[in-house]
Amino acid sequence: MNTKPIVLVVMDGVGVSDKELGNAVKSAYTPNLDYLMENCSWTAIKAHGTAVGLPSDDDMGNSEVGHNAIGCGQVYSQGAKLVGESIANGSIYQSETWKKLVENAKGHTLHFLGLLSDGNVHSNISHLLAMITQAKKEGLNRIRVHCLMDGRDVPETSGLNYIKQLEDHMASLNDDTFDAKIASGGGRIFLMIRRPPRSTLVGSVRCV
C-alpha cells in the first residue's frame, strides 16, 4: 500500500472572508495558499462559537480554543461553557475541590481571585456570582473578592460595569450572617501575562 505523509499546519489568525477592509489575509501576497485553494479540495470550517464548544456564536475563537478542538472529530464543551454547565447541573459543587474549599473556609474568609469579565475566553462573571451565592447557601459567612480587570477580551473601558454588577449582587446577599466585599484588584496584563518581568509580578501579587 502506498502511503504519503500528511502535514497539519496551524496558521493562527488566518481566516476566510470576502471582506476587503481590514482583511490582512486577503490583502497579503499568499502564492502558496492561492495555489492550494485553486488546485486542491478544501472547505471552510468554523473556528468560533458553538462549533468549537464555546457558549454562543458571539464568542470568538483564539489559539487556545483552536488547539483544544483540533483533531477531536466532534464538539466538546470547553472553557467558559464547560464551567457554566458544571455550575448549572451542580456538579462543580459536588467536586472534592469545592467541598474542601468550603470546609476550610468555615469560620474564616473564602477568597476568590480571578478575571472579572464576561469575555468567555478565560472567564465569565456569572460563574463568580453563582459561586458566591452557593457559598452563602453552604453556610459561609465572609467572602472577599480580588478582581483582575480584563480590557482585552472585552472593551478596555468596561471594567466599572463588571464592578457594579458584582457589587450589586453581593449587596443583594449581604445581611447579618453574610459579608461579601471586594478586597483588592489588579489588571490582567500584570498578573496573567505568561512571562512577566519579576518586578512587575512581585509588585502585583503583593497588591492583591
Label each region the model flagged:
Residues 208:
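Conserved small/polar residues in nucleotide/adenosyl-binding loops
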Residues 192-195:
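Secreted, luminal/periplasmic, and some membrane-associated catalytic domains
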Residues 2-6, 14-190, 203:
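Active-site nucleophile/metal-coordination loop of metallo-enzymes that catalyze phosphate/sulfate
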Residues 197-200, 205:
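Conserved anion/nucleotide-ligand pocket segment
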